[in-house]
Amino acid sequence: MSMTPREIVHELNRHIVGQEDAKRAVAIALRNRWRRMQLPAELRAEVTPKNILMIGPTGVGKTEIARRLARLANAPFIKVEATKFTEVGYVGRDVESIIRDLADAAVKMMREQEIQRVRHRAEDAAEDRILDALLPPARQGFGDEPIAREDSNTRQLFRKRLREGQLDDKEIDIEITETPSGVEIMAPPGMEEMTSQLQNLFSSMGKGRKKTHKLKVKDALKLVRDEEAARLVNEEELKARALESVEQNGIVFIDEIDKVAKRANVGGADVSREGVQRDLLPLIEGCTVNTKLGMVKTDHILFIASGAFHLAKPSDLVPELQGRLPIRVELKALTPEDFERILTEPHASLTEQYRELLKTEGLNIQFAADGIKRIAEIAWQVNEKTENIGARRLHTLLERLLEEVSFSAGDLAADHSGQPIVIDAAYVNNHLGELAQDEDLSRYIL
């Protein structure tokens, strides 16, 4: 990952509108990882990531920034809710399961990459197995060279027909390695590790057993291709690489961190919120967690915590946790101009998604500039009057706005015969105007 912070921000701008401070902070954090890897080994071990605390209302892009960052870095990533965890001793998940889940995500990511790498070899091997089932090898006989050549020519002809899909519906008998059926084990919260070990034990029983199936060629080809790809992947090497990737590149996003802050002057039931924070301390500071991959050191995993902090303040977190989240970034609430940009600027924007979805039914819709402006204004107004859910309000508005069009898309396509339906300000006011003005209606519908 050798992108500069400026390039990282430019890439994030393709998907997220505004929030420049947050983008700069995560871009620097990601670049510092690359810088650290260029250092001598002795100094590299001493440089730890500067963890980030994002503060801002819901729906402004906190989670999306972290998710896009992980995709850019091609790094193991996991998003967790702080409220799902409890202090050790209470019923609920303990915080170490975060690292176990991150390790599972790393293995899955590495396996997908490795399967992609060996895909062509797996396809060739799968083709050969299918051809063996279609054309059993000729018996060896005296002076069989011409037969072998003829067999080779026939095989190439069948290979060509196979690749062109002419044999897809032909049925063959083929031997497939059976996948052990998984055993679902219900266990109380906090015992995930034991459950995982039991599931692994049961799934290993009967592993490698083969069975002959009668399948169509196109179905058999997919199964055999997956089997050959799995055979070409070196599991031990894959796990070693996944372990290194978790330790050096892992990113953990902890949402709703404000919900485990103990608010000042608030009494009542409290299932040890402060205890969850104290359990998070060693994880963020650096400790060793036992996982299926082995012992994972968390010293160089990047932690990004986020919260709205409506009721609590960042200073309500325990001081030790505040110290372990040194970079503070405040994300701003969205303005009508931001909503307007969200509807048009990002790659695969909402308006583009709806346009392409309806195009599949032959219906052409166009969003006029004044229509987009009016949608943005209504989204902002409803957020101000009711709960502020940020950009998520646009999903609700657009679903409501295009409900009739989506329901009757096939009929409308026939009626308009290629002419576009224009979503302008008048159309928006006609479908959303009254709902936006009536606070009681907008509270329940928008």
UniProtKB/Swiss-Prot annotation:
Its main location: cytoplasm. It holds the Pfam family AAA. It comes from the Bacteria. GO terms for biological process: protein unfolding; proteolysis involved in protein catabolic process. SMART domains: AAA, ClpB_D2-small. ATP binds at V17, G59, V60, G61, K62, T63, E64, D255, E320, R392. CDD domains: RecA-like_HslU. It is found in: Cytoplasm. One of its GO terms (molecular function) is proteasome-activating activity. SUPFAM superfamilies: P-loop containing nucleoside triphosphate hydrolases (SSF52540). GO terms for cellular component: HslUV protease complex. Keywords: ATP-binding, Chaperone, Cytoplasm, Nucleotide-binding, Stress response. Gene3D superfamilies: 1.10.8.60, DNA helicase RuvA subunit, C-terminal domain, P-loop containing nucleotide triphosphate hydrolases. Belongs to the ClpX chaperone family. HslU subfamily. A double ring-shaped homohexamer of HslV is capped on each side by a ring-shaped HslU homohexamer. The assembly of the HslU/HslV complex is dependent on binding of ATP. ATPase subunit of a proteasome-like degradation complex; this subunit has chaperone activity. The binding of ATP and its subsequent hydrolysis by HslU are essential for unfolding of protein substrates subsequently hydrolyzed by HslV. HslU recognizes the N-terminal part of its protein substrates and unfolds these before they are guided to HslV for hydrolysis. NCBIfam families: hslU, PRK05201.1. This is ATP-dependent protease ATPase subunit HslU. The lineage of its organism: Bacteria, Pseudomonadati, Pseudomonadota, Gammaproteobacteria, Pseudomonadales.
